[in-house]
Amino acid sequence: MFSTRKLATALTAGLLLVVTACSSQGGAQNTPGASGGGAAGGKSFAIAMITHEAPGSTFWDRIRAGAEQAAKQHGIDLRYSNDPDSSKQATLVQNAIDSKVDGIAVTLANAPAVGPALAKAEPVGIPTVVFNSGIDSYQKYGATMYFGSDESLAGQSAGTRLAQAGGGKAICIVHEQGNASLETRCAGVKKSFANTENLQVNGQDLPSVQSTIGAKLAQDPSISDIVTLDAGIATAAVQAKTEANSQAKVVTFDLSPDVVKDIQGKQIEFSVDQQPYLQGYLAVDSLWLQLTNGNDMGGGQPVLTGPSFVDAANIDKIAGFAANNTR
């Protein structure tokens, strides 16, 4: 895996030279004509990006910002769609194939449900890449490249830091039912920090998330650490522990302006960053390179965009990028 991580690092460094501030697009369903010149030979390609984004999650704003930046640079018609229901996401994939797009980038949070639809692209000559989730299954369904974090490694790395800090018991908050990547993260945490218990919440109902975490803290005062897998859930966890008068420490995956402030304010110990902007950028950029020059990245292996840690030691350096919606 060293070579793929090295590649991702190099790409990140190069990308920072061309990044411009991108505005958040929130929950819009489509990104028509996100073009701006740069297409090879004057040809504009249509690329579909299909994710399992759920309403209200700001995480995907950075995915889209990266994708839109790559589309703008290469004159690509980027067609974004999403549905957290895996069967409906599979339908969106089939719709993209039927519309004869030039390439497809997709997340595989539920690979058995979405993968069979994706596999239909290769026989009709549509190249596909997977990003964010699906590291263990992307090749099975015909995708040539994967861009994202190794979720097991990320979880283990977080668990190791908890163990080194002397924690006693952790709860790992799973906010999307059936999302294999989240389960893998928690399993990774438990591998390095054995006394870890999963807690299922409904990530689309933040008041409920806060009350569920608060009730768990009140029920079990031995909890020393709260591991959240999403920046919005982290904010709810900070509020829950404050209201419960708990001394538990909060750690999280992913960044947001609120998480940045909470790391600076010592309310969150650290964030495990998978660099979603980079995931979106590379997913679109790689398809353009494949279509125009026959390139592939990673040498048949996943290209890792994480894990990397953001904590008190480096938060001031990264805060500006987070404010630009690029970290």
Regions found by a protein language model. Name each.
Residues S44-A70, H74, R79-A90, L108-A111, ...:
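Extracytoplasmic "Venus flytrap"
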Residues T12, S23, K43, S192-F193, ...:
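Hinge/cleft segment of the Venus flytrap/periplasmic-binding protein
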Residues T58-Q73, A154-A158, A180-N198, T212, ...:
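Short, solvent-exposed amphipathic alpha-helices that sit
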Residues A90, V106-E122, V189, G203-K261:
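Hydrophobic alpha-helical
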Residues Q89, M145-A170, S208-Q210, L255-V259, ...:
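Hydrophobic alpha-helical segments within soluble ligand-binding/sensing domains
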Residues V19-A39:
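Bacterial lipoprotein signal-peptidase II cleavage site
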Residues M1-G26:
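Secretory targeting and sorting signals
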Residues P112, P116-L153, S256-Q264, I268-E269, ...:
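Flexible loop/hinge segments that line or gate small-molecule binding clefts
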